[in-house]
């Protein structure tokens, strides 16, 4: 998984799996720049349940002021499966 800051957005790409979450967990509070308000997920190819929990943690750390932009159909499916539509603010989607 790769995280690339882009102004008020950060782009996540690759796979967000349990292994990646374990590697990133200690840095979660400082992982995103202070001005980041969007997570661009257009190049996030896969997330497992640990990845979804990690995204929830990032949103919680921002007190809900973090939008998931362009989540893939797979990520949208997990959001619906776990009934997280009210938790996550999303915009756009990828095919």
Positions of predicted regions on the chain:
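STAS-like cytosolic regulatory interaction modules
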Residues: 1-50, 57-95
């Amino acid at each position: 998984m790769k995280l690339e800051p882009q102004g008020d957005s950060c782009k996540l790409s690759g796979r967000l799996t349990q292994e990646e979450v374990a590697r990133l967990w200690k840095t979660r509070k400082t992982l995103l720049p202070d001005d980041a308000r969007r997570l661009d997920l257009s190049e996030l190819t896969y997330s497992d349940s640990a990845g979804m929990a990690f995204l929830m943690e990032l949103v919680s750390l921002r007190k809900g002021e973090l939008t998931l932009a362009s989540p893939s159909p797979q990520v949208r499916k997990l959001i619906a499966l776990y009934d997280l539509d009210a938790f996550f603010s999303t915009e756009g989607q990828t095919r």
